[in-house]
């Protein structure tokens, strides 16, 4: 057996489809999804993963209908203010928001910044990508590299990703951390997020550990 992935990317997807198929309220579907994301984070931490980057919203997603965005924002605020504090130790866990903060509503930003302030541990990192755009990330890394006098590869705030889980069968990264995912093990699930169980996550990590990760070598 090889090591568990150090850094997992999570692309929660399919809440709108799930709500339509189950005749449910969109906000309720996203809140249920937030609970599932939290369960996945707890499981990954238990399995030895040290960092998880969660794709909450791309900048392109901000063009969606207000009804859809309001549901995402409401669920995200529950995630930051209730679910994370209930399941993680602030002395162990770090929460970081990545993306264009100026494009996010005040309530969302306050909830995220509250979690960032409260959670500053060094054992497990939760990166949340919101209003994120890869072009912005590269440009920001370029500026940071010039300021620090370092190589641009050392100026990215988020490191290399070993495994990506998307909770839909569409084989797309949708702009998720393209520089960091160059050699990531990509998993596209047929099980919707709101029906995903932790034993399935355990299986995915166990299967990853069966093979050496050569990263092009």
PLM regions with names:
Residues 1-217:
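Flexible, compositionally biased loop and terminal segments
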